[in-house]
């Protein structure tokens, strides 16, 4: 059997063993996708004992490509809601994540001085304990630049392998422990997160208001500032027994009932100006109007603003709200349409059908993946991650790497949505398949590489003490910040799990957090919110520690 065939076969075996381990649950808790790492360690041990030789170049390519696939699909998934989340809760999340990095660095420094751990070993333990491969590479590079002998630099890789498994287990254990301590109901947490997911952090509501302000009598809707802005949509007007779709030129009269869509604060302001809320139904049932959800799939309208399509004027149809990647938005005229946007239309059946034809509404297109944008995005992400950033006083240039670059590029492209006929929408099923494939490939190789010398170092060397040091570096920051975030900041549990996973730049932990409630995007969103800054800090922290320890040691 050729080296390539043998390598592929072993990787498949690792995936099977690891996924089986991940599916084993104790009291409802399992390793999930993280089991693949331990499958790799087990198989790697026996492969080493059997004297098999695998293609190291192929393993390296598979490991990096798997990581790229995982972070890219995460970025595409959360991109549309990432920047809105950053505005609403990003500062708080990033402050907690930075605190985890700082505490981890302090624990590492204390262990280095107390137990006189060699510099390459303690840096490897630090990188493995926070499950950050780019930190390992950055640390090895600066050690070489500082003149450290190569045999000492290689020790960093072994100590990394010792600490890495508990780095993953530690964060999973922390999530489980916090869930038990605070008696978390995951379903309730998911519902609470869902209720706060909008552009401005407040749920989109509807309200029926009676026109009671005499100053508004015989005014056109376009002449009433609160109704002519982008914060509130007036989607229906009822006068006596007649229900119709209002246009900007529609004249309102005292006693008219208006159906308004917007955020609670804006609707409250509308009440103060227009009149009181009423319980009268403005349902389209029994009328010649209907409400329908239509999806944007026509390439000709991508990137166009809602106001430029003139649906009110041409078809007498109102867009009452817009759903983008699960986030409900007020359909203001300045919003540009993206592929996959879901619009709520109100109008007559024939008019809605005409607007649906303009928008596309081709459901089958939602199941298709444009592969050209996928590889354009990955390519641009790799280029971004390869750009060196030179900082005065640092002997090695800083880079985002193959994990940070594709993630940030995917966030940007996911937010842009489309450029011309290229769109970065990816069906959820395809996104999940690529994401799971990527993380399985990545962890399989990491496990295989760690498995060969893992048992020998663990039994006959200093492996146990290294694991103990790594456990402290992993657990102390996570538990401390987790308790603070829940008790002081009242942070949503799923959001907190994503933040903890992101602070460790730990894809398996994110996969575990996602599986806590598969339909909630809370963990993925908070993970992506803190990941870019944390990745940068994780890359420079070992370099800072190396320079600090080298100068004082």
From Swiss-Prot:
The chain crosses the membrane at residues 4-24, 28-48, 65-85, 95-115, 158-178, 371-391, 393-413, 439-459, 464-484, 493-513, 533-553. The keyword RNA-binding does not apply. InterPro entries: AAE_transporter, RCK_C, RCK_C_sf, Transpt_YidE_put, YidE_YbjL. Its main location: membrane. It is a multi-pass membrane protein. Gene3D superfamilies: Regulator of K+ conductance, C-terminal domain (3.30.70.1450). Keywords: Cell membrane, Membrane, Repeat, Transmembrane, Transmembrane helix, Transport. One of its GO terms (biological process) is potassium ion transport. Disulfide bonds: none annotated. It comes from the Bacteria. Residues 191-276, 279-361 form the RCK C-terminal domain. The keyword NADP does not apply. GO terms for cellular component: plasma membrane. GO terms for molecular function: monoatomic cation transmembrane transporter activity. It is found in: Cell membrane. Belongs to the AAE transporter (TC 2.A.81) family. YidE subfamily. This is Putative transport protein YidE. It comes from Shigella boydii serotype 18 (strain CDC 3083-94 / BS512).
């Amino acid at each position: 059997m050729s080296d390539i065939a043998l390598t592929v076969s072993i990787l498949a075996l690792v995936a099977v063993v690891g996924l089986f381990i991940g599916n084993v649950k104790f009291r409802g808790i399992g390793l999930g996708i993280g089991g693949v790492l331990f499958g790799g360690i087990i198989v790697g041990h026996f492969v080493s004992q059997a004297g098999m030789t695998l293609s190291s170049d192929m393993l390296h390519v598979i490991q990096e490509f798997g990581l790229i696939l995982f972070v890219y699909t995460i970025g595409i998934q959360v991109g549309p809601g990432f920047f809105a989340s950053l505005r609403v809760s990003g500062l708080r999340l990033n402050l907690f994540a930075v605190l985890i990095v700082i505490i981890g660095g302090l624990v590492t420094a204390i262990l280095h001085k107390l137990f006189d751990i060699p510099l390459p070993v303690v840096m490897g333990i630090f990188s493995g304990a926070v499950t950050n491969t780019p930190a390992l590479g950055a640390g090895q590079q600066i050690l070489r630049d500082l003149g450290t002998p190569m045999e000492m630099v290689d020790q960093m890789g072994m100590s990394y392998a010792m600490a890495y498994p508990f780095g993953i287990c530690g964060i999973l254990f922390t999530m489980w422990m916090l869930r038990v301590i605070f008696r978390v109901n995951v379903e309730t947490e998911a519902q609470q997160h869902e209720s706060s997911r909008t552009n401005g952090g407040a749920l989109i509501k509807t309200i029926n208001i009676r026109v009671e302000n005499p100053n508004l009598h015989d005014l056109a809707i376009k002449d009433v500032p609160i109704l002519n802005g982008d914060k509130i949509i007036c989607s229906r007007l009822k006068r006596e027994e007649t229900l119709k779709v209002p246009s900007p030129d529609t004249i309102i009269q005292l006693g008219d009932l208006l159906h308004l869509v917007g955020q609670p604060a804006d609707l409250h302001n509308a009440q103060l100006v227009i009149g009181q809320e009423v319980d009268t139904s403005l349902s389209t049932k029994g009328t010649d109007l209907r409400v329908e959800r239509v999806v944007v799939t026509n390439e000709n309208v991508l990137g166009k603003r809602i106001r430029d399509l003139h649906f009110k004027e041409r078809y007498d149809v109102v867009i009452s709200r817009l759903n983008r990647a699960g986030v409900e938005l007020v359909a203001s005229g300045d919003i540009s349409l993206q592929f996959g946007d879901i619009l709520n239309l109100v109008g007559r059946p024939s008019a809605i059908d005409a607007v649906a034809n303009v928008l596309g509404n081709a459901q089958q297109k939602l199941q298709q993946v444009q592969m050209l944008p996928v590889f354009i995005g990955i390519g641009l992400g790799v280029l971004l991650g390869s750009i060196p950033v030179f900082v005065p006083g640092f002997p090695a240039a800083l880079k985002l790497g193959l994990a940070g670059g594709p993630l940030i590029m995917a966030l940007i492209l996911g937010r842009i949505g489309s450029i011309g006929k290229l769109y970065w929408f990816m069906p959820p099923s395809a996104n999940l398949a690529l994401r799971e494939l990527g993380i399985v490939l990545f962890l399989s190789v990491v496990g295989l590489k760690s498995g060969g010398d893992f048992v020998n170092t663990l039994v006959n060397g200093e492996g146990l003490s290294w694991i103990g040091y790594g456990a402290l570096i992993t657990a102390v920051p996570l538990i401390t910040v987790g308790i603070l975030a829940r008790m002081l900041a009242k942070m949503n549990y799923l959001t907190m799990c994503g933040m903890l996973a992101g602070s460790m730049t730990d894809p398996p932990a994110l996969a575990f957090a996602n599986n806590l409630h598969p339909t909630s995007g809370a963990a993925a969103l908070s993970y992506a919110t803190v990941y870019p800054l944390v990745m940068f800090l994780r890359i420079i922290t070992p370099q800072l520690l190396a320079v600090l320890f080298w100068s004082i040691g």
